[in-house]
Amino acid sequence: MEASPKNILYIDDEVHNLTAFKANFRRYYTIFTAESAFEGKKILAEKNIQIIITDQRMPGMTGVEFLASIINDFPDPIRILLTGYADTETVIEAINKGQVYRYIMKPFNEAELKITIDNAFEVYSLRDENKKLMEKVLTINNQLEFMLRQRLLS
């Protein structure tokens, strides 16, 4: 069986954060980086991304605004918000508007973030498997309904 891809999109306007993240995690995952929400949307349109990690405070569009803006077009990726600022209102917005899986404070602990990312990939995988099983159930249910109608008509 083919291993599932482990693609992460990390968005941060600070290049040194992107470089450090990629250096820390590239041996475990395929990392795509973007310096803006616009670049992030472009990568999402081109690549199969399972995890989106974004900084909250960026020029032009906050992390929460970005995550909320992509929900309709990209509903499946698991979302993680990184921020250097604790703000209750942002946490609430992140959960309610951005459907954030985890809210993590900077500076992050590499080992803890890796565990969070691994858990996020597990959640993604389980959701994907559930979706496929539901499609299979619907197909089988439709077949059974058809067979029942055929039997009732004969």
Predicted regions span which residues?
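Receiver (REC) domain active-site loop signature in two-component systems and cognate sites
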Residues: 58
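Alpha4 helix (beta4-alpha4-beta5 surface) of REC/receiver domains from two-component response regulators
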Residues: 65, 86-102
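C-terminal output helix
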Residues: 89, 108-117, 121
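Helix N-cap/capping motif at the beta->alpha junctions
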Residues: 33-42, 63
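Conserved phosphotransfer cores of two-component systems
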Residues: 45-47, 70-76, 97-98
